[in-house]
Design a protein with these regions (language model features):
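Catalytic alpha-helical scaffold of carbohydrate-active enzymes acting on polysaccharides/glycoconjugates
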Residues: 2-255
């Protein structure tokens, strides 16, 4: 309770120091672009047989945007303009990597491996050209990518559960996902990439940010974008990590 209150106060203080305006602005911002949640369409029916009535809407609809999805979305945005001739621009809060399930399994769930989300897109049905549509939308100022995280799974917790024989997570793993309606063996949400599990190594959080931002900078051809607030709120000795990484990758960063 006290920790949550502390984080809320810190968030408000950070926002108070930020930019403000009296203009009425509509912000189009959407999370988790690039991250898998549901399996590829080739395995989705098996997944839905296993979990036929999930209460969580993300387990019904949350998946990578296909070429058809993106074409419809960007076509809709292109048809809309303000009185200055500007299109709406969507902020894609981007997750830059997904687990490499094959390599993780080969290691006996002892080592974590990831692949850039652009490689994931190539493997998913009807997604091979999706990233080209991203790049076109960036060039046409229909979309603006922003770093949201390396991957959207709590890696230390997930691997520990797999090594301990959590059958539900092992079954989901074979379908190419970690998402199950409820992981009853832990109070930590598997989606919460940076939540604590026992004593996580100091290097895990630093690697998460360093490697994630490196992938992000590479995929947007060297641009420098902002870090999402989800990686800012850490306690104790880890407080310096976001500052260090932000200064390295965001040329406009100020304390």
């Amino acid at each position: 309770m006290l920790s949550n209150l502390k984080n809320r106060v810190r968030a408000h203080l950070i926002n108070y120091k930020g930019w403000s305006t009296k203009r009425k602005i509509v912000v189009f911002e959407s999370d988790d672009w690039g991250a898998i949640r549901l399996p590829d369409i080739t395995k989705i029916e098996e997944y839905r047989k296993r979990y036929p009535y999930p209460k969580n809407p993300y387990l019904k609809y949350d998946s990578l945007a296909s070429e058809e999805d993106l074409n419809v979305l960007f076509s809709l945005i292109s048809d809309c303009k303000d009185n200055f001739g500007n299109h709406p621009k969507l902020t894609f809060n981007t997750v830059v990597a997904n687990p490499d399930f094959k390599k993780i399994k080969e290691s006996g769930f002892k080592q974590y491996y990831y692949e850039p989300f652009t490689e994931t897109l190539k493997r998913f049905s009807n997604h091979s050209q999706s990233f080209n549509l991203w790049k076109n939308a960036i060039d046409e100022k229909l979309m603006y990518p922003q770093f949201h995280g390396r991957e959207h799974v709590n890696v230390p917790l997930w691997l520990e559960e797999l090594r301990n024989g959590n059958q539900e997570l092992l079954d989901a793993f074979d379908l190419g996902t970690w998402s199950v309606p409820e992981n009853k063996s832990s109070i930590i949400n598997l989606q919460a990439s940076l939540d604590w599990i026992k004593e996580q190594p100091f290097t895990y959080h630093k690697d998460f940010l360093e490697e994630g931002l490196k992938e992000f900078v590479e995929f947007i051809d060297g641009s420098r974008e902002s870090i999402m607030d989800k990686v800012i709120f850490m306690e104790g000795e880890r407080d310096g990590i976001p500052v260090e990484v932000a200064m390295r990758y965001n040329t406009s960063y100020t304390e």
